[in-house]
Amino acid sequence: MKDLLAFLVSGCAIGGGILKILPAKAFAKEAPRTGKWYGFGVSVDKCIGCNRCVEACKIENDVPREPFYFRTWVERYVIKKDGEVIVKTIETKPEGVPEAAVDRSILRSFFVPKLCNQCADPPCVQVCPVGATFQTPDGVVLVNAKTCVGCRYCIQACPYGVRYLHPQTRTADKCTFCYHRISQNLLPACVEVCPTQARIFGDLNSAASPLARFRRMNKIHVLKPGLNTEPKVYYASL
């Protein structure tokens, strides 16, 4: 088990990303002193890989039905006793995800939901030549499709691989935390449909928000902290 922990923290597990347990004080520099500052939590041990979140996102945000276009997706990680790591994206199917066969060579298997990390210091915003990618005052990175020229600079700059070029509009697209919903005090579609409450959304500046409670009660990881993008998607139970 010590070897597994070392493997996870070393950065080889989650999509090549670097994982790090962060103390509570590390979050203080992200949020402005006033106003809302949105973030997201994922409880890995609660995710069952049902893909309801993915389906809800595609419907809510008119994401292309082709399997390689996602605003959010779920990956299955299988860590074997010999150190081999197998990563597969769970496909969206009406019948759900089939049960994994019993394999005594497997040390650990789990699901990891992925989405835009809504970085506090987003590289995608910095590289956009026309200002189409921007950050709202409440910390959500959006794309103005009317001004996006489809140059793909932001897609290349994103270290988390969460952006894609929409095949119809030919503009950059990605997760927005369902900004049209949260602006009306509704939850993101993926959070609303999750049957196990594995996804948590909230205001980082509110001590009473579900996300604040999630961070207080769990050891938190973020993806690729060494890049200093200050991601605002926090993972527990990795």
Predicted regions and their residues:
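Non-ligating segments of multi-cofactor redox enzymes
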Residues: 1-238
